[in-house]
Amino acid sequence: MQATFFLEKEVRKMFKKNDTVLYSSEGVCVVNDITQRQFKDRIMQYYVLKPVYKEGATVFVPVENKDLVAKMKRILSVEDIHQLIEDMPNQTIEWIDNDNLRKDKYREILRNGSRKQLIQLIRTIYLKQEELKKIGKKIHATDDNIFKEAEKILYEEFAYVLNIHKEEVVPFIFHQIELKEKS
């Protein structure tokens, strides 16, 4: 029990009220509160997250659940985003031919991956999509859904940090890559 208390104290230091975090597939969230709630016969502490781009939504993350808390990541800085964009042209991961293995691996990246892995995932699926388009085919619906989810997570964070609209993220990225290529 004492170890749990230590963990709670340690985790509580990690995030405080009004911190902005990236939380799994919910995207950019503000830590609205750290509260206690009765759950069965015990009181538990929760981070209360408000997704920035999902009006009216609330997410409760138990402070003691280190797996869920691990999905709460500090948002990137402007400098981090520029570095990710600069490295973007070289970022891909291996295309996995087995549909089930690919789905599992790519969903794992969505759940727990770094931003670099998200960029690699987006670029890999995009390149496969373009390759198939040339021969009159399309990617599987599952791959398309994973692609859209990865874009949503990454582009919402970029938009929030850069203080631009989500629709402006892709043009911003292309512009930054263009500038880098010219220099």
What annotation goes with each model-predicted range?
Residues 29-31:
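Conserved hydrophobic positions within beta-strands
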Residues 66-183:
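Charge/polar-rich, low-complexity and marginally structured segments
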Residues 37-48:
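Short, solvent-exposed secondary-structure boundary/capping segments
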Residues 1-13:
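Short, Lys/Arg-enriched N-terminal segments with co-localized hydrophobic residues
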Residues 18-19:
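Loop/turn positions that initiate beta-strands
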Residues 53-64:
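A short macromolecule-binding patch
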